Amino acid sequence: MDSLQLWQRYCDWLYYHPGLEIFVDISRIRFTPPQVEALRPRFAQAFADMQALEAGAIANPDEGRQVGHYWLRAPELAPTPEIRQAIQDSIERVETFAEKIHRGTIPASGGGRFTELLCIGIGGSALGPQFVAEALAPLHPPLNIHFIDNTDPDGFDRVLGRLADQLGQTLVITTSKSGGTPEPRNGLVEVKLAYQKAGIPFSAHAVAITGPGSQLEQQARQEGWLEVFPIFDWVGGRTSETSPVGLLPAALQGIDIRALLAGAATMDEATRLPHLERNPAALLAMAWYIVGQGQGRKDMVVLPYKDRLLLFSRYLQQLVMESLGKSHDLNGNRVEQGIAVYGNKGTTDQHAYVQQLRDGLNNFFVTFIEVLQDREPGIPSPFVEPQVTSGDYLNGLLQGTRQALYENGRDSITVTLPRVDARSVGALIALYERAVGLYASLIQINAYHQPGVEAGKKAASAVLELQRRLLETVQEQQGSLTLPQLAEKLGCPERIETLYWIVRHLHANGRGVLLTGDPARPLELSIQPQPA
């Protein structure tokens, strides 16, 4: 196509939402009219599936659960009065609690207001709040936010080291739907110990966000924590940003959560429309399907041209990959579906991997995120060249990259926001939640469970149980053992490599095992109890 034909294609396929001022452009995806027509029956079913989901159908058949994140920003759509009331109550409780913290009505244990916020969580309990904090937190928030989102001891030390003199002014939120997920539990144990060592009552600083009746809820109530907020059974971690999981940290930072919810609700209305060309999420799902031939053959590279949106690609990694990366479809057929997602930000990436995108392996499509407003209103932009600002350069480099990629046969989508504010970010979250759901219907997979994650947890538990047995055996041993001898003694010669990893880690951390010999020759290493 020449430039005028491309312009006409752009105009023909451009989506614009006048209330949100958001554009979606799929014109640089090379699809044809026959491909679109072939997908219409699939979309008719996808729209019907989505309507049933919102009405309360069991949309997660593997776990027998409803899927209700859309109700969070439109409680009136909830299938029962009880769910509707629970949603409304949770939002009001979040707002009331945040206001009390800001005013000092709930003070820190040593007196004065809380100034720091430490969020302990994993997966969606961290990625959503991190993205929203980076995008929307004011320059001088009422509480400065920090995260523990792993079970890395050095990571704990670094975060707690930064907060060492401020633990007395730090509010700690622990988020875990089940209440027993190892990573947040481990973080909670270590943070609680830090408070005990500092002589500060942890319960006067602690808040839980968890499922009703969970171990975490029981602990919080028994120990008299400040508050417990719910995670509803019908909300998954990766779609929990508009639940207390995301709303509470946002509200405590002074972010307008009502605007966030309103933006999501408005986008939900737009993406509820059962009309392919007039539904922005359907347009995204169609583009993903065609560019990857319905099999995820192309990676999604996310390039937001805005520093505030730096973490959007990490947020989308979980939303897209955990939802769509499935081995079997709804009929039990082995399909190995998924779309790989990665990215950072423009223009940084133009000086990193865009070289490969332009000239190397064509195994991707790009999603550009454009923001029209350069900076906050009232802040002038100086000229860096005659009649050119830094923001003009940002815009020019986005356009230039989009053009250079297309000219070399590389496809792209562009999503344009008017500005980065709570309303736009809420809409962006809702847009991609719906696109993922529609795409999942197109390829007939369950987007709302994560059996692969559970498999990893089970394997980790088996490793830790083997470690306990190993330590007992080594401590009882007189003299030394080789790895094969240890494996034979434990009755698991087939797990010798796992044993090697365990003893190497224990030795490196002074944990009761002494390993001697040449590290390059694992079979010849000598294993014995660490001297007292």
Swiss-Prot record:
Annotated localization: Cytoplasm
CDD domains reported in the protein's UniProt record: SIS_PGI_1 (cd05015), SIS_PGI_2 (cd05016)
Catalytic activity: alpha-D-glucose 6-phosphate = beta-D-fructose 6-phosphate
A molecular function (GO) term: carbohydrate derivative binding
GO biological process, one term: glycolytic process
Active site feature: E322 (proton donor), H351, K457
Pathway connected to this protein: Carbohydrate biosynthesis; gluconeogenesis; Carbohydrate degradation; glycolysis; D-glyceraldehyde 3-phosphate and glycerone phosphate from D-glucose: step 2/4
One Pfam family in the UniProt entry: PGI
Keyword Transcription regulation part of the UniProt annotation: no
EC number of this enzyme: 5.3.1.9
Keyword set, alphabetical order: Cytoplasm, Gluconeogenesis, Glycolysis, Isomerase
Recorded GO CC terms: cytosol
Keyword Cell membrane: no
Function: Catalyzes the reversible isomerization of glucose-6-phosphate to fructose-6-phosphate.
Family, as annotated: Belongs to the GPI family.
Protein name per the record: Glucose-6-phosphate isomerase
Native organism: Synechococcus sp. (strain JA-2-3B'a(2-13))
